[in-house]
């Protein structure tokens, strides 16, 4: 599931919702993560394979943009890069997809939910690259390191 929202008690593919006014769109780009948090479903392979957010393959930038083209993003409140892995593992995708989103709707709030290791993962300072593309960065403090 590439684009999803929280609906009821679980994750719902955006494409399968008939009404989504005011919902948040989550963008699931990767399963990769440098952390091994004991509470995370990723650490239990059996659970990871059956979880609806586990990606069989990483979506290309073009595939993600195609999913956005199939919906009216003006119906949503916010777009968040978050999923089963660490979004900054796909920095190139975040940048290109955010450029697309801001081109379509410059007022759409965008956010990354991250472990905060983006600079280490990418071996460079990433904040300047995200300027004017990402409005909010939420850093999880749950990792054991």
Where are these regions (language model features)?
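Short coil-to-beta-strand
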Residues: 36-38, 132-139
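Canonical Radical SAM [4Fe-4S] cluster-binding loop centered on the CxxxCxxC motif
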Residues: 13-63
